[in-house]
């Protein structure tokens, strides 16, 4: 039997083919529904347009006046101010468009996934879903009603990933907004696997790095996922992720001696996962990876 099975397939279709009550751990990172919520993408285009025309540029005289107004003691921000008209440089217009896979995702679709998560997990199985911090209350309600309007996941807990090397967005304006990501954890019925004690559910790991062109825009740290898998499952258990992205959950499962089944709907990222596994002399098929 193959211990690692990955398909190029849509997530709902993939989950429906799994046996009910067969999964020990679902560890996943669905679209956060943030691309459509933000006006930042329009702002990014406007900034690029102004940069190209040179309309953002400032003069030496303007810098001197700006420096005096702000009380700056040195010229640390001078280059950015002269070129972009602001002290942060053009990075302040950080893009929040993660692609069609986020734009086309909906709360209704997420609800459909969560109901299937509950159905496929064994009693005592654990579900961990990373999601937008500002929408956690919505996620919590969906998890609590995964079976019926009054029945669903129990023991809902908060998991936090503190990034040790966050991008310095608006670093001189306010607290860093992108230094953490969060997940909610739920149990199907009772008696979950939990290989830890007195655990705060807070993890400190850096942003995952990788080869150019192979990183997913929302990729999670491999050691973080290995840690979560070891705490919430045992060796030989089945881990599932229907939003595989760059393949982190699959590699973390392989590294911790768990069985894994997952899928990725985006053809480009599925090919990236294939490329990563091919470095380990794995024989690959067009639409699946079996190890």
Task: Give residue spans per PLM region.
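S-adenosyl-L-methionine-dependent nucleic acid methyltransferase catalytic domains
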Residues: 1-167, 178, 195-291
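Core SAM-dependent methyltransferase catalytic element
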Residues: 122, 176-177, 182-192
């Amino acid at each position: 039997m193959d211990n690692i099975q990955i398909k190029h397939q849509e997530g709902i279709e993939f989950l429906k083919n799994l046996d009910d009550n067969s999964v020990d751990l679902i560890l996943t990172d669905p679209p956060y529904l943030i691309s459509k919520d933000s006006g930042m993408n329009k702002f990014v285009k406007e900034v690029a347009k102004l940069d190209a025309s040179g309309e953002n540029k400032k003069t030496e005289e303007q810098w001197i006046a700006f420096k005096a107004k702000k009380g700056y003691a040195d010229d640390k921000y001078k280059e950015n101010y002269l070129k972009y008209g602001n002290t942060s440089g053009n990075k302040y217009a950080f893009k929040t468009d993660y692609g069609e896979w986020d734009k086309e995702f909906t709360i209704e679709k997420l609800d459909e996934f969560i109901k299937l998560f509950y159905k496929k997990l064994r009693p005592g199985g654990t579900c961990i879903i990373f999601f937008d911090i500002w929408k956690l209350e919505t996620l919590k309600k969906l998890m609590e009603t995964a079976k019926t309007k009054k029945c669903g996941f129990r023991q809902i807990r908060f998991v936090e990933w503190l990034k040790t090397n966050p991008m310095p967005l608006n670093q001189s304006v306010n607290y860093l907004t992108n230094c953490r990501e969060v997940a909610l954890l739920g149990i199907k019925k009772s008696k979950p696997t939990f290989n830890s004690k007195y655990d705060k559910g807070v993890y400190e790991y850096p942003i995952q790095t990788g080869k150019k062109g192979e990183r997913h825009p929302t990729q999670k740290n491999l050691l973080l996922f290995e840690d979560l898998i070891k705490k919430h499952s045992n060796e030989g258990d089945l881990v599932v992720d229907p939003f595989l992205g760059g393949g982190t959950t699959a590699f973390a499962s392989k590294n911790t001696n768990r069985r894994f089944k997952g899928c990725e709907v985006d053809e480009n990222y599925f090919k990236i996962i294939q490329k990563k596994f091919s470095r380990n002399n794995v024989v690959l098929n067009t639409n699946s990876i079996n190890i």
